[in-house]
């Protein structure tokens, strides 16, 4: 489906003036030569919504989607778009509970950039040291891979943090370290992606419930514990959820 089952609605009509999603889609198609599928385009347009002051509406984007859906390709496009087109050279941080996952996504982005002569010409350096992989552009833009842990990303101010496999985070250590890195930068976003988690996925469960409560708790995650007048107090306007999932109680083959 192009549209997720559960999602944070936009504050106003989305146009080229109120979302940078179209810019990112055009970068994918006209520069990288990648044709995005409808759900990827829909998500970029909605998740890159702008506030009236021109900053991103969402500081945190939670993406729930099945494996093999094209999630990694979209994240790579997003990362390169910001690296090459942001006015201020950004720092992109890629992280995951398993470093191999973050390095695999980073490697794909490097290959994308190298495959386009105009982009390849802007590459200053590609660091391949174990645990310190980085793509550096002439402009000063960086895309670094960090292990998700207490030290992951600390001391770095990330403009875009790509946090994959959120379901694997069973403690708050890594999330706290990474989320902390973006607070110092205006225009920064954390994109946290995952497929469905289980009871041990504490970070995913909390972020999902917080976002759902702001939407009136459509799946009953709070178990009726939140009074309607409390929903506004608990809502976090800077948290967006985009969830492609089956409704509770639906058959597995829906």
Name these PLM-found stretches.
Residues 1-254:
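Phosphate/NTP-binding elements of NTP-utilizing enzymes
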């Amino acid at each position: 489906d192009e549209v997720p089952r559960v999602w944070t609605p936009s504050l106003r009509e989305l146009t080229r003036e109120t979302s940078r999603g179209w810019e990112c889609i055009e970068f994918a198609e006209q520069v990288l030569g990648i044709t995005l599928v409808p759900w990827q385009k829909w998500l970029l347009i909605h998740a890159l919504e702008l506030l009236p002051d021109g900053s991103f509406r969402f500081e945190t984007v939670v993406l729930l989607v099945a494996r093999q859906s094209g999630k990694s390709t979209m994240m790579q496009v997003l990362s390169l778009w910001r690296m090459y087109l942001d006015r201020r050279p950004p720092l992109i941080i890629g992280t995951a509970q398993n470093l191999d996952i973050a390095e695999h996504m980073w490697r794909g982005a490097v290959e994308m950039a190298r495959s386009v002569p105009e982009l390849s010409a802007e590459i200053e350096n590609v660091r391949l040291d174990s645990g310190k992989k980085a793509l550096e552009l002439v402009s000063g833009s960086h895309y670094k891979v960090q292990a998700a842990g207490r030290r992951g990303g600390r001391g770095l101010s990330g403009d875009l943090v790509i946090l994959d496999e959120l379901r694997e985070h069973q403690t708050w250590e890594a999330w706290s370290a990474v989320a902390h890195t973006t607070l110092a930068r205006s225009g920064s976003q954390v994109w946290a992606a995952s497929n469905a988690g289980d009871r041990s996925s504490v970070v995913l469960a909390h972020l999902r419930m917080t976002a759902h409560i702001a939407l009136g708790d459509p799946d009953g995650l709070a178990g009726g514990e939140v009074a309607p007048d409390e929903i506004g107090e608990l809502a976090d306007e800077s948290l967006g959820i985009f969830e492609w999932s089956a409704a509770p109680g639906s058959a597995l083959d829906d």
